[in-house]
């Protein structure tokens, strides 16, 4: 037998052993773990009309916004019914929409709005702001039965900008994650 043939055969054998050992090292038992929580039933969202909630701001004067910088708070209530779950379960609500480019965390007015110079803020009733597009959202404790998820919204004047009077609309998506 040729010496170079024996050497190359030895290299192939050595490479095969290394490959076999490396695949054995990565094939350890129980190296992937799954966990979760199954609820018997989450809550049903109450939809009135075509929206989950419709918020009408009262008429706000430009002068009030220019002086105070923001409007009074208006309630935003999401209604959940038939909630069933273990003691201490919660719902995390995240709010997504077009974020105001000048006021991070605030909802931008729709481009069809004639009013300008403001964004819409959202907060929990304890005053903690819930920023638009923040994946942390806001967490609420649930009880079995019916629950109201309470937020408040307000108009926030943009710093250094004039407020233009007119009508406005804006929309966002509320996502509910039961945890």
Swiss-Prot record:
What do we know about what induces or represses this protein's expression?
A: Expression is negatively regulated by H-NS and subjected to cAMP receptor protein (CRP)-mediated catabolite repression.
Compartments annotated for it: namely:
Fimbrium
Among the GO biological process terms of this entry, one is: cell adhesion involved in single-species biofilm formation
Q: Mainly resides where?
A: other
The further comment given in this record reads:
The operon is cryptic under classical laboratory conditions, but is functional when constitutively expressed.
Give the similarity note.
Belongs to the fimbrial protein family.
Query: Which protein is depicted?
Result: Uncharacterized fimbrial-like protein YfcP
Question: What organism does the record attribute this protein to?
Answer: Escherichia coli (strain K12)
Chain's gene name:
yfcP
């Amino acid at each position: 037998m040729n010496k170079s043939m024996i050497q190359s055969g030895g290299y192939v054998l050595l490479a095969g052993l290394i490959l076999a050992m490396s695949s054995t090292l990565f094939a350890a038992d129980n190296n992937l773990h799954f966990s979760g929580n199954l609820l018997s039933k989450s809550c049903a969202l109450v939809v009135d009309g075509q929206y989950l909630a419709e918020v009408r701001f009262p008429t706000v004067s430009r002068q009030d916004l220019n002086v105070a910088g923001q409007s009074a708070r208006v309630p935003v209530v999401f209604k959940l019914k038939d909630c069933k779950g273990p003691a201490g379960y919660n719902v995390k609500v995240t709010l997504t929409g077009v974020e105001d480019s000048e006021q991070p965390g605030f909802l931008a007015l729709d481009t069809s709005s004639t009013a300008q110079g403001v964004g819409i803020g959202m907060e929990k009733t304890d005053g903690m702001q819930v920023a638009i597009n923040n994946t942390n959202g806001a967490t609420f404790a649930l009880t079995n039965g019916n629950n109201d998820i309470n937020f408040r919204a307000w108009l926030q004047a943009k710093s250094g900008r004039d407020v233009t009077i007119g009508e406005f609309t804006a929309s966002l998506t509320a996502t509910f994650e039961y945890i």
